A protein has these predicted regions:
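Alpha-helical and His/Cys-centered functional microenvironments
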Residues: 7, 31, 50
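Sec-dependent signal peptide recognition
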Residues: 17-27
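N-terminal secretory signal peptides that target proteins for export/translocation
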Residues: 1-18
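Gram-negative and organellar
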Residues: 38-412
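N-terminal signal peptide c-region/cleavage motif recognized by signal peptidases
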Residues: 33-35
Length: 412
């Protein structure tokens, strides 16, 4: 697809090698921000942003590992340009979000990368009883260093296509269904075993109470295909699987200020090869939100669930954890938010190769504190400090990391 910018030259090209599409968005932002074009119900909202971050352990270097002369901390700078689109045509609602970033690391230039975040959605309606969503997303970014600590640039691409719909059978009953396809790929050869395609189908039925609360059940089937076999010594493993779920789904409006959400039930995963890795057990997630006052909000969450991960030694982890967050609006322009999180991950997917890989369990504690300031309706400034502590039974994978992020965003 051709991505040439308009002929009008708004300002000179800066030295950063951004994609052409990002500069098109910048030009569009200046043009649509002119007084003659601006409107309160603006459909297209371009924006630009800039951020500076410092992390004292970018690569997740383990405690007690001797790395003489190796750089583990770095300051990074991220420039971004994007556009948000929201358009309503009758009952139909169309939305799009496009974001392009350029991130540069001062001490680790080999990690410099261009990122993309593209999202499209059509919230469709047919009469008063049928509605749903049809959309797609694409995200390209640097993969996290949780389980991979090398200095090579490891870009991860995630693509998702989805469709869902609901039918209001009765004022008190709603039938819903959905399908999706998720594709994840890595650039780095060492991570190719983690490439996967997951296809999901879901069917649910909800009771809609007059109070606004809902209670229902849902069935979900997921097929996960790993095109590249995992090599562990002399073993060659196929991590493809089928997963079935039967869960209860509850959204309880306890009061006008308190809401409780629950999703939990039986989950069963069967692998195409090596049944010792199969899983069957209860999974659940609960979220509680409390608006304590007009300015203070509190969120509490707890979970026990299996999930995929960025690691080539396990097909899944069993994650159990809890988090506590709060948001405090000091004024119309100033907000403070923070979160405490504790999670334990059991690498159960390595059971088949216990003779090759040791049993592994990780515990992660994370604390964040942020400040957001909006001096004008278009400009947002932010600062965030964080501290992570990872403790692992796997040698060399226990490490702390502390960081600070300063960011800004201007929406035209």
């Amino acid at each position: 697809m051709k991505q040439d910018c308009p002929v009008i030259e708004v300002f000179p090209m800066p030295p950063l090698p951004w994609p052409r599409a990002a500069w098109c968005l910048l030009h569009l932002g200046v043009l649509t921000s002119l007084p003659a074009l601006a409107a309160p119900d603006q459909v297209v909202r371009p924006y630009v942003g800039y951020a500076v971050a410092h992390d004292d352990n970018v690569l997740g270097a383990g405690d007690g590992v001797d790395r003489p002369g190796e750089v583990v901390s770095s300051t990074s700078r991220r420039a971004e340009a994007g556009v948000l689109v929201d358009k309503r045509i009758g009952q139909q609602a169309l939305s799009a979000a496009l974001r392009f970033t350029r991130t540069s690391y001062e001490q680790l230039p080999e990690l410099n990368n261009d990122g993309k975040d593209l999202r499209l959605n059509w919230n469709w309606h047919v009469g008063n009883h049928l509605d749903g969503n049809l959309g797609a997303t694409y995200v390209q970014a640097l993969a996290p260093f949780v389980n991979f600590h090398g200095r090579e640039r490891n870009l991860r691409s995630e693509r998702r296509e989805f469709a869902d719909g609901g039918w209001l059978l009765h004022p008190s009953w709603r039938l819903r269904t959905g399908v999706s396809r998720d594709t994840l790929t890595y650039d780095l050869d060492a991570q190719q075993a983690g490439n996967r395609v997951e296809k999901m189908g879901e069917l649910g039925l909800d009771y809609l109470a007059p109070s606004g609360s809902t209670i229902g059940t849902q069935l979900r089937h997921t097929r996960g295909d790993y095109p590249n076999r995992q090599q562990l010594g002399a073993l060659s493993l196929d991590n493809s699987y089928d997963q079935d779920e039967l869960k209860a789904k509850v959204s309880w409006l306890i009061t006008g200020k308190t809401q409780l959400q629950f999703l939990g039930g039986l989950v069963q995963r069967k692998h195409d090869a090596f049944a010792a890795r199969d899983y069957r057990g209860l999974n659940a997630r609960v979220n509680a939100n409390w608006q304590a006052s007009a300015k203070l909000g509190v969120a509490l969450a707890g979970w026990r669930e299996i999930g995929a991960l960025d690691d080539v030694t396990a097909s899944y982890t069993l994650n159990q954890g809890a988090s506590l967050g709060a948001t405090w609006d000091l004024s119309d322009k100033l907000r403070i938010d923070g979160q405490l999180k504790h999670e334990t991950s059991d690498y159960s997917g390595t059971a088949v190769v216990a003779s090759v890989l040791p049993e592994r369990k990780d515990t992660v504690r994370r604390a964040t504190l942020g400040l957001v300031y909006k001096p004008t309706a278009h400009l947002r400034l932010g600062a965030q400090a964080y501290r992570n502590e990872r403790r692992s039974t796997l040698a060399g994978n226990s490490y702390p990391t502390t960081g600070l992020l300063l960011n800004s965003r201007y929406e035209f």
